[in-house]
Every structure is written in C-alpha cells, then in structure tokens.
Amino acid sequence: RIDASVTPARLETAVIAAAINLNNELSEWRATQRAAGYTTLAEVPGDRIKDVSVKVHLYRRAIEAGTGAEVCERYRDYSATNTGSEKAEALTPNIDDYRRDLRWAVRDFLGISRTTVELI
C-alpha cells in the first residue's frame, strides 16, 4: 500500500519507469501486433471483461504492480532511522509480492505458464 508520504512527482516517476520496463519487455509482441495491423492494445482481438480487453486489464495490472514495487523499493531507501529501518524491512515482502504480480500479469498477457521448471 502506498501512503501519502509518496509525492505525486515520485509516483509519476515510478509509473513512467514501470511503463518503460513493461513496454521494453513486450516490444516483440507489440511489433507482431503492429505487423498484423493493430495500432492499439484495445484493437487486438481477444476475450473481454466488462467490455475491456483482457490484455488491457493485464497491462494495467502489470503497470500497477511494477509501480508498487518501484515505490516500495525507493521508499525504503529514503529512511535512515531505526523506525525507518523497521518500515523498510516490513516493505520487503510487499516488494516481492508486487514483483510476483508483475511477472504473473506479463506471463498471462503473453499466454505463457506462470511456472518455470528446470530439470536438474
């Protein structure tokens, strides 16, 4: 959860960073869709929920999760007091949860399994 101590400017920076990272990760997929004649994500055929493309929902989810992780990571770096250190330690599971949610949203978006398994 992002509290009021995060300024709008910091939040905007985190959203932009999340969007840049996500767009870079989806660049090949986007190129394929553009080659097929789709100019926006909403135009790409697929299932819909509440009249919005599932891909749009997943993209938004990935941006939200990436933003949350970015803000939590930066927020814990700003505090140097003992209380701040305790807050920073408490944020670590949230960061991991945000990163997991980001991975899942991207994998669902791309239609690949959420689980990576390697044989040893």
Feature locations, PLM:
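Short, exposed interaction segments that mediate macromolecular assembly or regulatory contacts
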Residues: 38-59
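Amphipathic alpha-helical interaction surfaces
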Residues: 21-28, 48, 69-77
